[in-house]
């Protein structure tokens, strides 16, 4: 059983890594996670990861026990694009408390979440070694989170989110693929950089001392590796993903 005293004694990072180690699949992970979080008076949790690309329809992965009808609605409405907790997670690793003010620019999202018993909560961003962003969301139907409680929860949620991201990445094949780095050769990186600077294939060929066909060959490989249909999209994705 989850004990606050044990977490404080071991340190929250060590504690959550140790209890998550018991889980052999996502069902077991969810049970262990809920047992811990219900001691903190939360009814629901979701661990979400949003792909950087494609820009207009990013892939969203959600794990936990959020109501299924809400998850389906969130995906169908593409709420990840306007969710302020997702936007926050891209620029900060600090937790953020839900409030009417936070969701003032997306009232439909906030209203529908409340209708699904997700009334009071917080979001805790975390980052893995590939720089991918995950967001842990904790929610409950009743009892607003006071500022004092929020402060006390900060070290707990930070440790939980980091351990959860590592465990989910180990268990789920789609997330492992999502977290896999694309490997570009040195020549491909040069082609990407020169293209980003506005150079044509002919100009890049002159600069690099190769023929235009060779540059175009590198472009095709880059597009295949990064999942782009043309070189403009390839450069945009490469910049967004931090490859150049």
Swiss-Prot record:
The keyword Ribosomal protein does not apply. Residues 177-242 form the HTH luxR-type domain. Residues 201-220 bind DNA. Disulfide bonds: none annotated. InterPro entries: Sig_transdc_resp-reg_C-effctor, TF_LuxR_autoind-bd_dom, TF_LuxR_autoind-bd_dom_sf, Tscrpt_reg_LuxR_C, WH-like_DNA-bd_sf. The keyword Coiled coil does not apply. One of its GO terms (molecular function) is DNA binding. It comes from the Bacteria. GO terms for biological process: antibiotic biosynthetic process; quorum sensing; regulation of DNA-templated transcription. Pfam families: Autoind_bind (PF03472), GerE (PF00196). Keywords: Activator, Antibiotic biosynthesis, DNA-binding, Quorum sensing, Transcription, Transcription regulation. Belongs to the autoinducer-regulated transcriptional regulatory protein family. Positive regulator of phenazine antibiotic production. May activate the phenazine biosynthetic genes by binding to a DNA sequence upstream of them, or to an intermediate gene which, in turn, interacts with them. This is Transcriptional activator protein PhzR. It comes from Pseudomonas fluorescens.
